[in-house]
Design a protein with these regions (language model features):
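DNA-contacting surface of Y-family translesion DNA polymerases
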Residues: 1-111
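Acidic, metal-coordinating catalytic segment for phosphate/diphosphate chemistry
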Residues: 86-172
């Protein structure tokens, strides 16, 4: 029927909300130091949390993954990932980075030359539907802080305001 121009499936009128948000990169050079990997993961968390805030979403969990090159056999291949659930769904960059870095400490193995790392925020839901019994004035202050950071970065360029854990030089 579609070949005759008769649609079989109706088109969605509105785009459906995303269910996850991934930010990952391959590094320009192999990374061996934990601090450089930590900066990269923190930076990816900041980008991912900014993306979900722009869509008015919150995440229930963050997954961190790292890997070495499968083609450099002399160094051995290593790949690992871990997920941590948030007690309350969030889009707070500070909370996301803190949890992601705690996971990174578990999966990092010294002596490997990492080629790629990334973060995935999962279980995304509408921020409006995220009210709970434990919401407080502190949460509202953090939300205002995140909006201020996002507005400043939008106005003056990405990463104008950032967390110290994301590094300054970004040599990776």
């Amino acid at each position: 029927r579609e070949l005759r121009g008769v649609p079989c499936i109706d088109l969605e009128k509105t785009a459906s909300k995303r269910k996850s948000c991934v930010v990952s990169r391959s590094f320009g050079k192999r990374i061996e130091k934990f601090q450089e990997l930590e900066e990269a993961v923190a930076s990816y968390c900041l980008n991912a949390s900014e993306k979900i805030r722009s869509e008015n979403l919150v995440a229930k969990a963050v997954m961190v993954f790292v890997r070495t090159s499968p083609f450099q056999k002399q160094f051995g291949f290593y790949s690992n990932s871990r997920t941590v659930d948030f007690p309350i769904a969030t889009n707070n960059s500070i909370e996301i980075v803190k949890n992601a870095l705690s996971v990174l400490k578990v999966i990092f193995r010294k002596g490997h030359r990492y080629q790629k790392a990334g973060v995935m925020l999962t279980g995304l839901t509408d921020a409006e539907n995220n009210e709970n019994l434990f919401s407080s004035a502190k949460d509202e202050r953090i939300n205002r802080l995140m909006r201020s950071i996002d507005n400043t970065n939008y106005r003056y360029g990405r990463s104008t305001l950032s967390l110290a854990s994301a590094g300054v030089r970004k040599s990776w």
